[in-house]
Amino acid sequence: MFRAYQLLAAALLIAASTAFAGESGVFSHQTVQAGDITLHYEFADAQSLAKQREFTAVITDGIRYYQQLFAGYPLDLTGKPYTDITVRVRHGKHLSGEADPKLLLLTWSDGMMFGIHNWQTLLLHEIFHLWSAESFRYQNGREHWFNEGFAEFYAFKAATQLGYISKRDALAIAAQPIGFYHSATGLGKLSLRDAGKDNQSKLDNYFLLYHGGWVAAMLLDHDIRSRTANKHSLDTVMRWLYQHYPRNIKLYNNADIIAAIKAGSGLDYQVFFTRYIEGTDTMPVAQHFDLGKALWDFEFNPEQQHQHVYLYHTLGILTDRQL
């Protein structure tokens, strides 16, 4: 669940359900049918109601994108797939959101969060959680690096492939989590797992946790693609977790993630996890790809773009149909 670093945004998020229920005169209910997807809107204000078509476009695009990724719709608490979702929307000063089974909450604005998130990418982050976090779920907060970091990774990959951000911007945006991770005060002192061990630690180590997890996702996906000639990726890993870890039966932990990667790709990443996820070593981004060179060649040297084909796939600039 994506929470803004600002305490005000966090407070708005915690109070969202009661605020929607308690404010008379601001409710506007609307049900929208989009194919097999049913959205039950609860708008808190006229500004949000006026953007219904925009919200619907992002939500339906996101659901269909992730449905293809996971090869199934999100699951409820009994393990049954669903396509009807309540969406509570309000306009506010800070971006924030929340996801629970059959429920999306969004506080939106026209501003940016940390220079990278707009309300569309934030909403794609929350939609991803209908699968990862709510359909299959972590045992405890020590897996939040995966839960939140991979949601960031896939939100921006989806946004790129769906056309909400440009391919050029996808490369520039990818530099942000790398920078935030490398400048986090806990880097080299606190493992990614310990960074999310409880709510206070998660807040205190926001950039290490969220952006470290995002960097881990980029490195793992790129490495899997490189070592398997693009035959496998994190997509198969996420699908495996969805299929084998429904939250009503069992919850996953770090060892299960390693097992899922091996099942989905045939590769063993125990050493990677020991050093960079459970340990405090800094992930060696430059050993995997040169993001600046990939952007330079994207802009000016099309004949050199083949050198970055796996990275372009990782970020959603190329799709797996463009091999």
Predicted region positions:
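Beta/coil-rich, acidic/histidine-enriched accessory regions frequently appended to metallopeptidases
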Residues: 247-323
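Bacterial N-terminal signal peptides that target proteins for export
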Residues: 1-8
